[in-house]
Amino acid sequence: MISVYERESDQAAGEEEYFRLPLPKRNQHEMFAIADRLSGGSRMTVICEDGKSRMARIPGKMKRKQRVRAGDLLIIKPWDIQNEKSDIVFRYKRTQASALSRRKLLPEAIDVF
């Protein structure tokens, strides 16, 4: 698992916290994407870092654990056969997405945080 460590200092206590955030595995063709709109039936339209708009499928294990909404930062994996479709691998929370944006790890095309 490729990850990045984020250090944030607590001004009052003087303590530092580390967050471990997964990054897309480029060798497995994963990439960042922003959820654009929900289509129903556990599918949504996403805007990828390469500028393409793809139909993304929310897998059952993610559908039961956490809700994906429009505007969320995601890691997706395009299908091998149909490149215009993809699977959602991971959803970042708002604080995690802003931490990636502060560290300049998001591509310019989707850095809206």
Language-model-derived ranges and their functions:
Residues 91-113:
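Short peripheral tails and domain-boundary helices/loops at the edges of structured domains
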Residues 34-35, 88:
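Conserved hydrophobic positions within beta-strands
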Residues 62-75:
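Short nucleic-acid-contacting surface segments enriched for D/E, G, S/T with interspersed K/R
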Residues 41-46:
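Short aromatic-glycine-enriched beta-strand elements
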Residues 38-39, 92:
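A generic structural motif
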Residues 50-60:
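Short, structured beta-strand/loop micro-motifs enriched in basic residues and often containing a Trp
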Residues 2-31:
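Short boundary/loop segments of OB/S1/cold-shock single-stranded nucleic-acid-binding domains
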Residues 77-84, 94:
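Short, charged beta-turn/beta-strand-edge "cap" motif at the junction between a beta-strand
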